[in-house]
């Protein structure tokens, strides 16, 4: 009897140690530069607007990381959208969403450190690193591109939602109440990373195991940040019942928390899977209204 318990404990300890080591391999799945795919990506971008409206550059963070960044200017508007992608791939895989967002405003896209052509290593990467990346982009958009903060929308997908939320809250904390992004659009967010881990293990009937492991994933606690969000920033959350990566309940639970304290918020049910969400008419019309009200 005691021997079996000892074996189980040893297995649990091994799993926990393995997860500590492998955590970043699970959480971050960057794709590096693929010349052919990047060539096709830039060729597609060139069809959106004139060449002089597309600017490709590398922005240096305070800790000397170079972030691969693209600015696609929409000359019909003085608004812009900063796009925060999810935990996998790189910006060359995001043409469709860039094309969609370009209908409404100029679009700034970038790869986090270690993703795509950006420098750095994901092995030691953490939430603070991505926060630094996001703030570097924000500062460039404000100081170099000269966009008014109230004319900037933050658009996040998956893990990028948490990065966008963190940036919006940091802006709210560090500046006066008149300095805030116009809107925050979150596609498939999670309530918190630890809650998501618990949810996954609960569905596998391993709730106690999930409770222990959730303590290893204490980053990206969006639920703790939301109360500090500027009340003037409009928030839209969209999630699909068919999302196989981040459960629908995660996004809806986050919306419920936001709606309790934030009047400028809306939840939209979308279709499709996590990486191929279907955007219904309600979503498209809501974004059109959001940007037209700017």
Swiss-Prot record:
Using the record for this protein, list the coiled-coil segments as residue ranges, or answer none: none
Q: Which UniProt keywords apply?
A: Glycoprotein, Membrane, Transmembrane, Transmembrane helix
Keyword Transport assigned to the entry: answer is no
An annotated GO cellular component: membrane
According to the record, which residues are glycosylated? 151, 170, 205, 271
Protein's UniProt keywords contain Flavoprotein: no
Q: What is its main location?
A: membrane
What is the official name of this protein in its record? Answer: Uncharacterized protein R595
Annotated membrane topology is: Single-pass membrane protein
User: Which residue windows are transmembrane per the record?
Assistant: 5-25
Subcellular location(s) of the protein: Membrane
Mind telling me which InterPro entries this protein's record contains?
Answer: AB_hydrolase_fold, Hydrolase_4
């Amino acid at each position: 009897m005691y021997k079996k318990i000892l074996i189980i404990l040893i297995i649990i300890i091994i799993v926990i140690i393995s997860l500590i080591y492998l955590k970043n391999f699970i959480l971050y799945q960057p794709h590096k530069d693929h010349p052919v795919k990047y060539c096709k990506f830039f060729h597609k971008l060139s069809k959106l607007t004139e060449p002089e409206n597309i600017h490709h550059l590398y922005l240096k963070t305070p800790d000397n990381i170079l972030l691969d960044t693209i600015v696609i200017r929409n000359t019909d508007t003085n608004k812009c959208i900063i796009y925060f992608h999810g935990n996998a791939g790189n910006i060359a895989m995001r043409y469709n969403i860039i094309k969609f967002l370009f209908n409404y405003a100029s679009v700034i896209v970038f790869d986090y450190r270690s993703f795509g052509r950006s420098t750095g290593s994901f092995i030691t990467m953490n939430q603070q690193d991505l926060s630094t990346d996001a703030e570097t982009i924000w500062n460039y958009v404000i100081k170099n591109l000269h966009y008014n903060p109230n004319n900037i929308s933050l658009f996040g997908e998956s893990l990028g939602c948490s990065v966008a939320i963190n940036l919006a809250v940091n802006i709210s904390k560090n500046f006066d109440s008149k300095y805030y992004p116009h809107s925050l659009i979150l596609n498939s967010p999670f309530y918190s990373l630890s809650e998501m881990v618990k949810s996954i293990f609960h569905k596998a009937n391993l709730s106690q195991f999930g409770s222990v492991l959730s303590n290893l994933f204490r980053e990206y606690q969006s639920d703790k940040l939301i109360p500090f969000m500027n009340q003037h920033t409009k928030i839209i959350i969209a999630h699909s019942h068919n999302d196989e990566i981040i459960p629908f309940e995660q996004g809806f639970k986050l919306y419920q928390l936001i709606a309790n304290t934030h009047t400028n918020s809306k939840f939209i049910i979308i279709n499709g899977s996590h990486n191929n969400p279907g955007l219904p008419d309600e979503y498209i019309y809501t974004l059109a209204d959001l940007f037209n009200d700017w």
